[in-house]
Every structure is written in structure tokens, then in C-alpha cells.
Amino acid sequence: YGLEKEKAPSLKQNKSKHVNAIEYHEMLKDKDSVVIDVRNHYEVDIGRIEPPEGGATFLNPEMRNSREFPKWLNLPETKKQLEGKRVMMYCTGGIRCERASALISQMERVGDLKETKGIAMVRGGVDRYLKTFPESGGFWKGKNYLFDLREAQMAEKEGELETTSKCCACERAWSKYEGK
């Protein structure tokens, strides 16, 4: 996160909870929750969790990299959105959530953030969520960007893929990210 060593959050003091994909899916239906996508903005552009109507509020930090997350968390409007809510988060496989949840936990501990109703992350990230809901995708829309030769992962829904993004040059629907 680009934080100085003494300001870096401790994973040992992290109070967040790992939940399985089925429990996470149910939590997305709770209107007293917010869900944060802690991936980079280009990953969010091609696919993301869209909580059901009347459920959790989706928050997108719109980060280019993880170093921007602490700045976003410290914005007054972000703090207000998290206050008194269950904070849920997800990333591709769970690693970025470990760090992000530790930072939120630390902010609560030192009084930089008013208390939430807890912090939860889906065990195994989007990868596990999609494997748990292989046909429907659960509340997932679009593709899950992968940093390997597979490039993306998606639910096995029948019919066409719901495209969630546009080409930055021509504005046509586009669901592939090429980081070249």
C-alpha cells in the first residue's frame, strides 16, 4: 500500500472474518452491508459483483493500484459509507482482501474509522465464488480478469455473456482487458 513500515497494518491483529461463498452470497442480500471491490479499476470494468436490489451497496474505489486504497479509505465520504455497516470485500483470489481488511481493522482499532458491523471477505475470492455458483454466477456480472494465460473466468451461463465494459477508444461493448 505504499505505507511506511510502522503504519502498515498487522495481519495478526486483523479482525476480519473469512466466509464461504454461500454465506457471502447471502450476506450480499443485506441492506446494512457495503461490498468493496478491492481489485484495480480495469478488473472491475470487465466484471464485478452486483448485489441484488435492496441488498448491499457496491463501492468501487476505482484504483489503478493498491497504493491508492488507503487514500480512498481516508476520504470523509468513504468513512461515512462504511460507518455502522457490515463491510464486505472481494478480490480475485483473496490476497488483496487480506491486506485491505487488515487496514480497515487497524483504522477501527486506532479510531480513524467509526466502528463497523464487522469485516468479511469471501474465502478464495471471486475464483471460489464463481466455482460455487458455476451455472448462474450468483451475483457476478461479466468476467473475472486473471493474471495468467487464461485471461478471464466467468460463470457457465447459457446464452450471451453480459458485457459490463466498453472499449476506451471506440466506446463499443467490450469485455476483454489486454494490458499491453
Predicted segments, located by residue:
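Rhodanese-like catalytic fold shared by cysteine-dependent sulfurtransferases
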Residues: 1-17, 25-33, 40-88, 95-180
